[in-house]
Amino acid sequence: MNTPPVSRRHSPKFASDSHRLTSARAFTSGSDTYHDVRPDYPPDILRLLRSARRVLDVGAGTGKFTQLLCESPRFDQVYALDPSMDMLRTLVRFAPVPAWQATAEHTGCAAQLFDAVTCAQAWHWVDTKQASAELDRITTRDAQVLLVWNTLDVSVPWVHRLSRIMHSGDMLTQGFLPSVYKPWIITDQVHDRWEQELLPAQVHELTHTRSYWLRSNERIRARVTANLSWYLGEHLGYGPNDIVTLPYRLDGFVLSKIAQKLP
Protein backbone atom coordinates (compact mmCIF):
# COMPACT_ATOMS: atom_id res chain seq x y z
CA MET A 1 0.00 0.00 0.00
CA ASN A 2 1.50 3.30 -1.07
CA THR A 3 0.81 6.21 1.27
CA PRO A 4 0.08 9.59 -0.38
CA PRO A 5 2.39 12.48 0.52
CA VAL A 6 1.76 14.55 3.63
CA SER A 7 -0.66 17.41 3.07
CA ARG A 8 0.80 20.82 2.19
CA ARG A 9 -2.49 22.66 2.56
CA HIS A 10 -3.26 25.56 4.89
CA SER A 11 -6.94 24.59 4.92
CA PRO A 12 -8.99 21.52 4.01
CA LYS A 13 -10.08 21.10 0.41
CA PHE A 14 -13.82 20.99 -0.20
CA ALA A 15 -15.34 20.63 -3.65
CA SER A 16 -17.93 23.29 -2.81
CA ASP A 17 -19.67 25.06 0.06
CA SER A 18 -22.26 22.29 -0.11
CA HIS A 19 -19.53 19.67 0.38
CA ARG A 20 -18.15 21.59 3.38
CA LEU A 21 -21.59 21.86 4.98
CA THR A 22 -22.41 18.20 4.34
CA SER A 23 -19.14 17.13 5.95
CA ALA A 24 -19.67 19.40 8.95
CA ARG A 25 -23.24 18.18 9.46
CA ALA A 26 -22.06 14.59 9.87
CA PHE A 27 -21.61 15.23 13.59
CA THR A 28 -25.27 14.68 14.48
CA SER A 29 -24.73 11.42 16.40
CA GLY A 30 -22.08 9.54 18.35
CA SER A 31 -21.35 12.34 20.80
CA ASP A 32 -20.62 10.01 23.74
CA THR A 33 -17.93 8.16 21.79
CA TYR A 34 -16.55 11.48 20.56
CA HIS A 35 -16.18 12.78 24.10
CA ASP A 36 -14.60 9.56 25.37
CA VAL A 37 -11.85 9.13 22.78
CA ARG A 38 -11.16 12.49 21.14
CA PRO A 39 -8.00 14.03 22.64
CA ASP A 40 -8.13 16.74 25.28
CA TYR A 41 -6.25 20.03 24.98
CA PRO A 42 -3.13 20.91 27.00
CA PRO A 43 -4.24 23.51 29.62
CA ASP A 44 -1.26 25.74 28.83
CA ILE A 45 -2.96 26.77 25.58
CA LEU A 46 -5.13 29.15 27.61
CA ARG A 47 -2.08 31.25 28.45
CA LEU A 48 -2.48 32.81 25.02
CA LEU A 49 -5.64 34.56 26.20
CA ARG A 50 -6.00 37.45 28.61
CA SER A 51 -8.47 37.11 31.46
CA ALA A 52 -12.00 37.77 30.25
CA ARG A 53 -15.37 38.49 31.79
CA ARG A 54 -17.36 36.61 29.15
CA VAL A 55 -15.95 33.97 26.81
CA LEU A 56 -17.86 32.08 24.12
CA ASP A 57 -16.75 28.64 22.87
CA VAL A 58 -17.88 28.40 19.24
CA GLY A 59 -18.30 24.98 17.64
CA ALA A 60 -17.92 23.60 21.15
CA GLY A 61 -18.88 20.04 20.25
CA THR A 62 -19.13 17.88 23.37
CA GLY A 63 -17.37 20.49 25.48
CA LYS A 64 -13.77 19.31 25.44
CA PHE A 65 -12.46 22.88 25.29
CA THR A 66 -15.44 24.32 27.19
CA GLN A 67 -14.45 22.23 30.21
CA LEU A 68 -10.95 23.67 30.07
CA LEU A 69 -12.38 27.20 30.09
CA CYS A 70 -14.65 26.37 33.04
CA GLU A 71 -11.75 25.00 35.06
CA SER A 72 -9.71 28.18 34.61
CA PRO A 73 -10.19 30.96 37.21
CA ARG A 74 -9.44 33.57 34.54
CA PHE A 75 -12.84 33.49 32.85
CA ASP A 76 -15.85 34.72 34.81
CA GLN A 77 -18.64 33.49 32.55
CA VAL A 78 -18.37 30.73 29.93
CA TYR A 79 -20.89 30.14 27.14
CA ALA A 80 -21.00 27.57 24.34
CA LEU A 81 -22.69 26.97 21.00
CA ASP A 82 -22.64 24.20 18.41
CA PRO A 83 -24.73 23.26 15.35
CA SER A 84 -25.33 19.72 16.70
CA MET A 85 -27.94 19.14 19.42
CA ASP A 86 -26.48 15.67 19.99
CA MET A 87 -23.12 17.25 20.82
CA LEU A 88 -24.73 19.88 23.07
CA ARG A 89 -26.60 17.25 25.09
CA THR A 90 -23.25 15.71 25.97
CA LEU A 91 -21.61 19.10 26.55
CA VAL A 92 -24.01 20.19 29.30
CA ARG A 93 -23.31 16.98 31.24
CA PHE A 94 -19.63 17.85 31.49
CA ALA A 95 -19.70 21.66 31.34
CA PRO A 96 -22.84 23.12 32.95
CA VAL A 97 -22.82 26.41 31.04
CA PRO A 98 -25.41 28.28 28.95
CA ALA A 99 -25.32 26.47 25.59
CA TRP A 100 -27.41 26.72 22.44
CA GLN A 101 -27.66 25.46 18.87
CA ALA A 102 -26.07 27.93 16.46
CA THR A 103 -23.13 28.40 14.11
CA ALA A 104 -20.06 30.62 13.92
CA GLU A 105 -21.67 32.50 11.04
CA HIS A 106 -24.97 33.06 12.86
CA THR A 107 -24.46 32.97 16.63
CA GLY A 108 -27.73 34.58 17.69
CA CYS A 109 -25.82 36.76 20.19
CA ALA A 110 -26.15 40.44 21.01
CA ALA A 111 -23.51 42.87 19.74
CA GLN A 112 -20.30 43.45 21.71
CA LEU A 113 -21.23 40.83 24.32
CA PHE A 114 -17.99 38.84 24.62
CA ASP A 115 -14.42 39.71 25.60
CA ALA A 116 -13.05 36.48 24.14
CA VAL A 117 -14.10 33.72 21.75
CA THR A 118 -12.56 30.27 21.36
CA CYS A 119 -12.94 27.86 18.47
CA ALA A 120 -11.27 24.47 18.94
CA GLN A 121 -11.20 21.90 16.14
CA ALA A 122 -13.96 23.72 14.25
CA TRP A 123 -12.72 26.75 12.27
CA HIS A 124 -12.07 24.62 9.17
CA TRP A 125 -15.79 23.79 9.01
CA VAL A 126 -17.01 27.38 8.81
CA ASP A 127 -17.29 30.06 6.15
CA THR A 128 -14.34 32.02 7.48
CA LYS A 129 -15.35 35.34 5.92
CA GLN A 130 -18.85 35.24 7.40
CA ALA A 131 -17.58 33.92 10.73
CA SER A 132 -14.93 36.65 10.97
CA ALA A 133 -17.62 39.30 10.50
CA GLU A 134 -19.96 37.69 13.03
CA LEU A 135 -17.25 37.37 15.69
CA ASP A 136 -16.39 41.02 15.13
CA ARG A 137 -20.04 41.94 15.71
CA ILE A 138 -20.48 40.03 18.98
CA THR A 139 -17.15 41.00 20.61
CA THR A 140 -15.74 44.08 22.26
CA ARG A 141 -13.17 46.28 20.54
CA ASP A 142 -10.20 44.73 22.40
CA ALA A 143 -11.50 41.14 22.28
CA GLN A 144 -9.35 38.13 21.41
CA VAL A 145 -10.23 35.01 19.44
CA LEU A 146 -8.35 31.75 20.02
CA LEU A 147 -8.31 29.13 17.24
CA VAL A 148 -6.99 25.70 18.23
CA TRP A 149 -6.33 22.40 16.46
CA ASN A 150 -5.19 18.98 17.63
CA THR A 151 -3.82 17.09 14.62
CA LEU A 152 -2.20 13.67 14.39
CA ASP A 153 1.52 14.24 13.89
CA VAL A 154 1.84 12.90 10.37
CA SER A 155 5.55 13.76 10.25
CA VAL A 156 5.88 10.32 11.90
CA PRO A 157 5.61 7.86 8.98
CA TRP A 158 3.51 5.18 10.70
CA VAL A 159 1.12 7.84 12.00
CA HIS A 160 0.76 9.34 8.53
CA ARG A 161 -0.27 5.96 7.16
CA LEU A 162 -2.63 5.47 10.11
CA SER A 163 -4.26 8.84 9.44
CA ARG A 164 -4.95 7.80 5.85
CA ILE A 165 -6.54 4.53 6.93
CA MET A 166 -8.65 6.33 9.55
CA HIS A 167 -9.47 9.20 7.17
CA SER A 168 -8.54 11.41 10.09
CA GLY A 169 -8.08 14.54 8.04
CA ASP A 170 -4.40 15.09 7.24
CA MET A 171 -5.40 18.50 5.96
CA LEU A 172 -3.26 21.14 7.66
CA THR A 173 0.42 21.33 6.86
CA GLN A 174 2.93 22.02 9.59
CA GLY A 175 3.31 25.80 9.82
CA PHE A 176 -0.13 26.51 8.31
CA LEU A 177 -1.93 29.80 8.92
CA PRO A 178 -5.73 29.81 9.26
CA SER A 179 -7.84 31.95 6.96
CA VAL A 180 -9.19 35.05 8.75
CA TYR A 181 -10.70 38.31 7.54
CA LYS A 182 -10.73 41.92 8.68
CA PRO A 183 -10.79 43.25 11.26
CA TRP A 184 -8.98 40.18 12.60
CA ILE A 185 -5.25 39.56 12.33
CA ILE A 186 -3.09 36.84 13.87
CA THR A 187 -1.14 38.41 16.76
CA ASP A 188 0.25 35.34 18.50
CA GLN A 189 0.59 31.62 17.95
CA VAL A 190 1.88 28.50 19.65
CA HIS A 191 2.92 25.12 18.28
CA ASP A 192 3.57 22.08 20.42
CA ARG A 193 3.61 18.30 20.40
CA TRP A 194 2.14 15.85 22.89
CA GLU A 195 0.85 12.26 23.06
CA GLN A 196 -2.40 10.40 23.67
CA GLU A 197 -2.48 6.78 24.87
CA LEU A 198 -5.26 4.51 23.60
CA LEU A 199 -5.99 0.80 23.36
CA PRO A 200 -6.44 -0.57 19.81
CA ALA A 201 -10.21 -0.77 20.35
CA GLN A 202 -10.19 2.92 21.26
CA VAL A 203 -8.30 3.74 18.06
CA HIS A 204 -11.22 2.12 16.24
CA GLU A 205 -13.62 4.25 18.28
CA LEU A 206 -11.57 7.34 17.43
CA THR A 207 -12.02 6.45 13.77
CA HIS A 208 -15.77 6.31 14.35
CA THR A 209 -15.76 9.99 15.36
CA ARG A 210 -14.42 11.20 12.01
CA SER A 211 -16.65 12.97 9.52
CA TYR A 212 -15.73 10.42 6.82
CA TRP A 213 -16.96 7.51 8.96
CA LEU A 214 -20.13 9.26 10.11
CA ARG A 215 -21.31 9.97 6.56
CA SER A 216 -20.21 6.61 5.04
CA ASN A 217 -22.34 3.55 4.34
CA GLU A 218 -21.84 0.15 6.00
CA ARG A 219 -19.76 -1.22 3.12
CA ILE A 220 -17.20 1.58 3.41
CA ARG A 221 -17.18 1.31 7.20
CA ALA A 222 -16.48 -2.42 6.99
CA ARG A 223 -13.55 -1.76 4.66
CA VAL A 224 -12.10 0.90 6.99
CA THR A 225 -12.47 -1.44 9.97
CA ALA A 226 -10.72 -4.30 8.17
CA ASN A 227 -7.85 -2.08 7.02
CA LEU A 228 -7.39 -0.59 10.48
CA SER A 229 -7.48 -4.01 12.18
CA TRP A 230 -4.83 -5.29 9.80
CA TYR A 231 -2.63 -2.23 10.25
CA LEU A 232 -2.74 -2.15 14.05
CA GLY A 233 -2.63 -5.90 14.62
CA GLU A 234 -0.72 -7.59 11.81
CA HIS A 235 1.43 -4.74 10.51
CA LEU A 236 2.28 -2.84 13.71
CA GLY A 237 1.91 -5.84 16.03
CA TYR A 238 -0.37 -4.35 18.70
CA GLY A 239 -2.33 -6.81 20.84
CA PRO A 240 -5.76 -5.93 22.23
CA ASN A 241 -4.32 -4.84 25.58
CA ASP A 242 -1.29 -2.97 24.24
CA ILE A 243 -1.11 0.80 24.49
CA VAL A 244 -0.95 2.73 21.22
CA THR A 245 0.82 6.05 21.78
CA LEU A 246 -0.50 8.57 19.27
CA PRO A 247 1.67 11.68 18.75
CA TYR A 248 -0.24 14.90 18.19
CA ARG A 249 0.58 18.36 16.93
CA LEU A 250 -1.08 21.30 18.70
CA ASP A 251 -1.54 24.55 16.78
CA GLY A 252 -3.04 27.64 18.42
CA PHE A 253 -3.59 31.14 17.04
CA VAL A 254 -4.69 34.34 18.76
CA LEU A 255 -6.64 36.85 16.68
CA SER A 256 -6.99 40.51 17.61
CA LYS A 257 -8.77 43.36 15.88
CA ILE A 258 -6.87 45.82 13.74
CA ALA A 259 -6.86 49.18 15.52
CA GLN A 260 -9.58 51.36 14.06
CA LYS A 261 -8.55 54.88 13.07
CA LEU A 262 -10.64 57.60 14.69
CA PRO A 263 -12.28 60.08 12.28
Task: Cite the ranges covered by each PLM segment.
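A generic alpha-to-beta junction signature in SAM-dependent methyltransferases
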Residues: 49, 126, 138-139
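Class I SAM-dependent methyltransferase SAM/SAH-binding core
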Residues: 62-106
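A short acidic, Gly/Pro-enriched loop at the edge of an enzyme's catalytic core
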Residues: 105-116
